[in-house]
């Protein structure tokens, strides 16, 4: 099975390494925008920029030429293309892949969030681009691979379980053939809306939980934020067309728990450091990586307003990030909300 992962960040690299190790017949290529970075990975077996100190599969092949990397997967009728860029790069990648295809194409993306300008979900962005290009339904099957997963742990071969949701079951079958090996479990879903809402909203809620922990508010407060945050996520997802069971699964509750409590979470770190008095600009400069919760917080709040869903925790995060509200004041406002039924 031939696979191409487009994007040599932490998650793209980790997944490529796992796939290369997963089965003897897997032929995996990793492409990235920086040829020097790819050369370093090929020479040392380590992605020193995003996964320092973690040894990658020796069977992983780095390919700096985009067309050759894409053609690698396209030459296999059972091949799979994985887009490992942030949400902001998804439209461009979709256009480039559609232009390169020679027949049916199967692709997945790894990004989580909503588009900042349009508030579109990733699958809506892809659908719009393919429709504008005149691609007929079924010519390109697409979907998302998501769930509770830190890239470093995946690259280290530690156990995890993920969800793949797509436009056709053949895509789920290919994703399971590619990744459902050794320590990784892949579960299928047809609820693209639900899994994408879960993947976006959990990042915003992780900022809130990190801020609570940064203020030293305790484990009770953490549990309350996660639980009430899950309620916010579910309300929004149902209003947008998702299914309730999705939010009780890996792409909802599972990803929220991991991102809100795990110390490898960039979004959690943002909240902790905001509580510690750092400015958002300082925090993002220090991180050096994408924190999707910051990027999509306003989009989540705008979507909620559009469909009439109340999301007080999300609104508080936006006020802290973009309106200068001190973290302690945001907590105070949440605690002063009127009593209500759960």
Swiss-Prot record:
Its EC number is 1.1.1.94. SUPFAM superfamilies: 6-phosphogluconate dehydrogenase C-terminal domain-like, NAD(P)-binding Rossmann-fold domains. Transmembrane segments: none annotated. The keyword Oxidoreductase applies. PANTHER family: GLYCEROL-3-PHOSPHATE DEHYDROGENASE, GLYCEROL-3-PHOSPHATE DEHYDROGENASE [NAD(+)] 2, CHLOROPLASTIC. Belongs to the NAD-dependent glycerol-3-phosphate dehydrogenase family. Pathway: Membrane lipid metabolism; glycerophospholipid metabolism. It catalyses: sn-glycerol 3-phosphate + NAD(+) = dihydroxyacetone phosphate + NADH + H(+); sn-glycerol 3-phosphate + NADP(+) = dihydroxyacetone phosphate + NADPH + H(+). The keyword Manganese does not apply. It is found in: Cytoplasm. It comes from Cupriavidus metallidurans (strain ATCC 43123 / DSM 2839 / NBRC 102507 / CH34) (Ralstonia metallidurans). NADPH binds at residues 11, 33, 112, 151, 266, 290, 292. Catalyzes the reduction of the glycolytic intermediate dihydroxyacetone phosphate (DHAP) to sn-glycerol 3-phosphate (G3P), the key precursor for phospholipid synthesis. One of its GO terms (biological process) is glycerophospholipid metabolic process. Keywords: Cytoplasm, Lipid biosynthesis, Lipid metabolism, NAD, NADP, Nucleotide-binding, Oxidoreductase, Phospholipid biosynthesis, Phospholipid metabolism. The gene is gpsA. This is Glycerol-3-phosphate dehydrogenase [NAD(P)+]. GO terms for cellular component: cytosol. Sn-glycerol 3-phosphate binds at residues 112, 147, 149, 202, 255, 265-267. The active site is at residue 202. PROSITE patterns: NAD_G3PDH. Disulfide bonds: none annotated. One of its GO terms (molecular function) is NAD binding.
């Amino acid at each position: 099975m031939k696979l191409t992962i487009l994007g040599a960040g932490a998650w793209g690299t980790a997944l490529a390494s796992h796939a290369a190790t997963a089965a003897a017949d897997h032929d995996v290529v990793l492409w990235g925008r920086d040829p020097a970075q790819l050369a370093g990975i090929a020479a040392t077996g380590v992605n020193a920029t995003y996964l320092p100190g973690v040894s990658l599969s020796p069977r992983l092949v780095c390919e700096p030429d985009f067309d050759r990397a894409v053609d690698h997967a396209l030459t296999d009728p059972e091949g799979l293309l994985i887009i490992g860029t942030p949400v902001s790069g998804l439209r461009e990648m979709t256009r480039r892949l559609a232009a390169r295809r020679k027949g049916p194409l199967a692709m997945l993306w790894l990004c989580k969030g909503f588009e900042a300008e349009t508030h579109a979900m990733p699958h809506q962005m892809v659908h719009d681009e393919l429709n504008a290009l005149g691609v007929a339904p079924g010519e390109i099957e697409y979907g998302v691979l998501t769930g509770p997963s830190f890239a470093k742990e995946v690259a280290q071969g530690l156990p995890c379980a993920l969800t793949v949701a797509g436009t056709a079951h053949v895509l789920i079958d290919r994703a399971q053939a590619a990744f459902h090996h050794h320590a990784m479990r892949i579960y299928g879903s047809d609820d693209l809306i639900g899994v994408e809402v879960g993947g976006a909203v959990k990042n915003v809620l992780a900022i809130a939980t990190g801020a609570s922990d940064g203020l030293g508010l305790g484990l009770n407060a953490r549990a309350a934020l996660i639980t009430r945050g899950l309620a916010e996520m579910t309300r929004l997802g149902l209003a947008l067309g998702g299914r309730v069971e999705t939010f009780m699964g890996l792409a909802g509750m599972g990803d929220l728990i991991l991102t809100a409590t795990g110390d490898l979470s960039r979004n959690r770190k943002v909240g902790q450091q905001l509580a510690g008095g750092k400015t958002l600009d300082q925090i993002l400069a220090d991180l050096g990586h994408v924190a999707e919760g910051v990027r999509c917080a306003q989009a989540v709040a705008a979507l909620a307003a559009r469909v009439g869903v109340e999301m007080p925790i999300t609104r508080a995060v936006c006020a802290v990030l973009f309106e200068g509200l001190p973290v302690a004041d945001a907590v105070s406002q949440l605690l002063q909300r009127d009593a209500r039924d759960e």
